[in-house]
Amino acid sequence: MIFGYNRCYRIIGFKRGRVESGCELMIYDEKRTGGAGMVEKEEFYLNSTNGVNKLHVILWHPLEEIRAIVQISHGMCEYVDRYDRLATFLAQHGMMVIGNDHLGHGETAKSEEELGYFPKAKGSETVVDDLYKVTKSIRARYPRIPYFLLGHSMGSFMARRYLMTYGSQLDGAILMGTGSQPPALLSAAKTTANSLSVVRGEHHRSQLMMKMAFGSYNKQYPSVRTEYDWLSRNDANVDTYLEDPYCGFMFTLNGYKVLFDVLSFIQEPAHILSLIHISEPTRPY
């Protein structure tokens, strides 16, 4: 099996392992050297806040003193283990790293059909609540260690919503590849996704939506090899992405609706009128 829990059998070099019920309760440790210190990699599952799915979680644990904790919120059409090199590097330098596959991604998706689909999700709220559940699971064990959230691309949008809801639980955040969309374009995209889902269903994968979302990304390059050249200037990185069955799949209409939901949420303007008297001692001088 490529999709589903059986992918855990592809693990190489584990020192200790336990596999039960098709890996649903699978836990393994993999010890690595290189760079600064030893790293132990642990894989486990947590129940999603949607009450249906199991979140696939990976923990990179430094075997020396833990200086900080970094939680990864990965991007669209990828999975948290794609950050293995970064996570291992950070762990070798004293930072514990943890992250989960979002709903509809990686090992959290139960089948190929579920890739790009967010089952029982209340928009992006469920994805963010899942991130917070991972935070609580590790914060309970290490309450005094500085904690940071790293979000990339779509994961940065989720991280920004996380900051608006659970920001007090963090010591800092790193937003990579984040951005925004013009309100008119976002409104048109939401209307299109909603209309298509009424006709074709939530699981439908639409070429039109894909062109609306990514069609312009390659236009800045004079010559391109693939439709994903915009991902990286390194051709090998692009090829690795294209060859990975957990990457580059087409989002469902449901998936796009969740994506547009989080963009709408984080871009909602806050209208603030600040009033201060000329004699107010706290006013700026």
Where are these regions (language model features)?
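Alpha/beta-hydrolase fold nucleophile elbow
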Residues: 142-153
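Alpha/beta-hydrolase active-site loop
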Residues: 119-139
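N-terminal cap/lid segment of alpha/beta-hydrolase-fold proteins
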Residues: 38-62
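Alpha/beta-hydrolase-fold enzymes
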Residues: 159-246
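Single conserved hydrophobic/aromatic residue that forms the stacking wall/gate
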Residues: 276-285
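Short beta-strand element of the alpha/beta-hydrolase
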Residues: 67-75
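Serine-hydrolase catalytic-loop signature spanning alpha/beta hydrolases and amidase-signature enzymes
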Residues: 77-85, 97
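Conserved alpha/beta-hydrolase
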Residues: 87-112
